[in-house]
UniProtKB/Swiss-Prot annotation:
Induction: Induced by low temperature and by cycloheximide. The gene is LOT6. InterPro entries: Flavoprotein-like_sf (IPR029039), FMN_Rdtase-like_dom (IPR005025), NAD(P)H-dep_reductase (IPR050712). Its main location: cytoplasm. It is an enzyme of class 1 (oxidoreductase). This is NAD(P)H-dependent FMN reductase LOT6. It is found in: Cytoplasm; Nucleus. The keyword Lyase does not apply. Has several reductase activities that are NAD(P)H-dependent and involve FMN as a cofactor, ferricyanide being the best substrate for reduction. May be involved in ferric iron assimilation. Present with 1270 molecules/cell in log phase SD medium. One of its GO terms (biological process) is cellular response to oxidative stress. The lineage of its organism: Eukaryota, Fungi, Dikarya, Ascomycota, Saccharomycotina. Gene3D superfamilies: 3.40.50.360. It comes from Saccharomyces cerevisiae (strain ATCC 204508 / S288c). GO terms for molecular function: FMN binding; FMN reductase (NADH) activity; FMN reductase (NADPH) activity; FMN reductase [NAD(P)H] activity; NAD(P)H dehydrogenase (quinone) activity.
């Protein structure tokens, strides 16, 4: 079973890689999940570098049924990445009470690829990012994803990179992340 951790920030100065690495380690180090044989792929939207969606396809994403119908090669590549995932963990900062435009752009470039996939949202920010977490979950429901829930991780405002002493403190969220992921796994197996 393949779990994708999609990093929602593309800023040059960001803590998203550290939060995504924390989530990945939490999953990999879980004794409860060790027999699940999970393959974890961290997907960095900064590296994928999708152009801003400007209706470059003749059809809107909801009308596209095959990866080959996308006009843009980066969108075709993105479609293949998402199609290969069984479970998706969105890791996103909260910017001005919302989630980043790059993440919205990446989500909006596709449609059918998201259907039925279990998802959870790990947001972070000075207040945990609960507003963007709720917004993103609503959008994912609209894409017919099976949204299991979200975790809001509070980090010190303006701390880039995260101080070494902060990352171990994130472990208070381990159990919540693992419970949500276990629900995603169960949902995937029961499809």
């Amino acid at each position: 079973m393949k779990v994708g951790i999609i990093m929602g920030s593309v800023r040059a100065k960001r803590v998203c890689p550290e939060i995504a690495a924390y989530v990945k380690r939490t999953i990999e180090n879980s004794e409860e999940l060790i027999d699940q044989k999970l393959k974890i792929q961290v997907v960095d939207l900064q590296q994928i570098a999708l152009p801003l969606y400007e209706d470059d396809d003749e059809l809107i994403p909801a009308q596209i049924k095959s990866v080959d119908e996308y006009a843009d090669s980066k969108t075709r590549s993105w479609s293949r990445i998402v199609n290969a995932l069984d479970i998706i963990v969105f890791v996103t900062p909260q910017y001005n009470w919302g989630y980043p435009a790059a993440l919205k752009n990446a989500i909006d470039r596709l449609y059918h690829e998201w259907h039925g996939k279990p998802a959870l949202v790990v947001s972070y920010g000075g207040h945990g990012g609960s507003k963007c977490n709720d917004q993103l979950q609503e959008v994912l429901h609209g894409l017919k994803m099976n949204v299991i829930g979200g975790v809001a991780v509070k980090i010190p405002v303006g701390t880039i990179p995260l101080p070494e002493d902060i990352v171990p403190q994130l472990s208070v969220h381990n159990e919540e992340i693992l419970q949500l992921l276990a629900s995603c796994i169960e949902t995937t197996r029961n499809k």
